[in-house]
Amino acid sequence: MQAQSYVKVINFVRLTLKGNYMASILGIGNALTDILALLPDDSFLKEFHLPKGSMQHVDMETGDKIWKTLKPMGVQLVAGGSAANTITGTAIFGMESAFIGKVGDDDLGHLFKSDQAQYGIRSILLKGVNSSGRAMVFITAPNAERTFAVYLGAALELVPEDLDPEWFKGYDYFHIEGYLVQNQATIRRAVELAKAAGCIISLDM
């Protein structure tokens, strides 16, 4: 997932180099923590009714149960989400980078912020009512087949009224996550604010 984002980022950064000046970018998207779990067999998947090799969205109850069960298993955690991955890439390449999203007041929300902080990203993370969103990836032996369970959680709570015009000022580019299409009112408001701030707008598909 991240490899594809970084290919896009390399091409994007090439376009934003202006002499000795590196452009700045603000992104908005679903703030999700990627959780990678290696499973010896598919018994875990069967327990949570996840067909092997599938990608499913799950509700809060199921998402929280899966995460509680995964915690002791030594899983790998990293801040993810399409736009967040792009912003991480631009930060790594030296662009001043910031990200707008919504998380829960929980361990995964704190991890998301600290993970972005290590790359120097300015995290504008609002607190939601629900628990933090997560993309859980299960890699099952013996053929390393991947199964996905996605819980969007607090990320879905981002609304137009959350957006502050001051956040958009001073950035050259504004990047929107394509997966936010389900939240059209928020996208429209974000585009209005970005245009008012003079940003060039990009959208991943």
Question: Where are the regions a protein language model picked out?
Answer:
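Glycine-rich phosphate/adenosyl-contacting loop at the front of the ribokinase-like
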Residues: K18-A98
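Residues that cap or flank secondary-structure elements
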Residues: V78, V103-G104, Q182
